[in-house]
From Swiss-Prot:
It comes from Oryza sativa subsp. japonica (Rice). The chain crosses the membrane at residues 64-84, 124-144. It is found in: Membrane. Residues 1-27 are annotated as: Disordered. InterPro entries: Cop_transporter. It comes from the Eukaryota. GO terms for molecular function: copper ion transmembrane transporter activity. It is a multi-pass membrane protein. This is Copper transporter 6. The keyword Transmembrane helix applies. Its main location: membrane. Residues 1-25 have a biased composition (Low complexity).
Length: 184
């Protein structure tokens, strides 16, 4: 006959004594699992792992340079797709309707193209973000340089200032509002 509180599970093991020192060392990790160190602070090395396990890794400075060029190009293309997205949005959805009222809705093909460009831009932006999360300073600098280069080529519209007679460079900020808030 079972007594009160007897659930049939047997006696419970006692908790280890509370003392200032450990009574047993932790067992070593299993040998079949590969230990992988992840940096949580920025570091400078050509032995980084960016986006894909083992890449560029221990493959040397040449592969690291290729990785940096890839991140730079990815960031620049992200800026280029941003401009393309704005142009498609202006072209597809800004036409006035025949009655002079609200703008006519964009055709479905225009909306689908705009959605595809947006999805590609966001995918590239997330890849750049994940690359920067490697905490490698070179990758961070490549991402910033890529965004700057993409902005310069796609959005700033830098061209020679021949028409104003000056020897400088005229710069129009296409798609960006003026800094003073005016509508010019």
């Amino acid at each position: 006959m079972r007594g009160m509180g007897d659930d049939g599970m047997g006696p419970m093991a006692m908790a280890p004594p509370r003392s200032g020192h450990a009574t047993a060392a932790a067992p070593p990790p299993p040998q079949h699992k590969m230990a992988m160190m992840m940096h949580m602070t920025f570091f400078w090395s050509d032995r980084a792992v960016v986006l894909i396990r083992g890449w560029p890794g221990e493959r040397g400075a040449g592969m690291y340079a290729l990785c940096l060029l890839f991140v730079l190009a990815l960031a620049a293309l992200t800026e280029g797709l941003s401009v393309l997205s704005r142009r498609l949005a202006r072209r597809g959805g800004g036409a006035a309707s025949s009655d002079g009222g609200r703008p006519a809705p964009a055709p479905a093909s225009s909306a689908a193209l705009l959605t595809a460009v947006h999805a590609a831009r966001m995918g590239m932006a997330y890849l750049v973000m994940l690359a920067v999360m490697s905490f490698n300073v070179g990758v961070l600098l490549a991402a910033v340089a890529g965004h700057a280069l993409g902005f310069l080529l796609a959005r700033s519209r830098v061209r020679p200032a021949a028409r104003d007679g000056g020897g400088g460079v005229a710069c129009e900020h296409g798609g960006l509002p003026p800094a003073d808030g005016s509508k010019t």
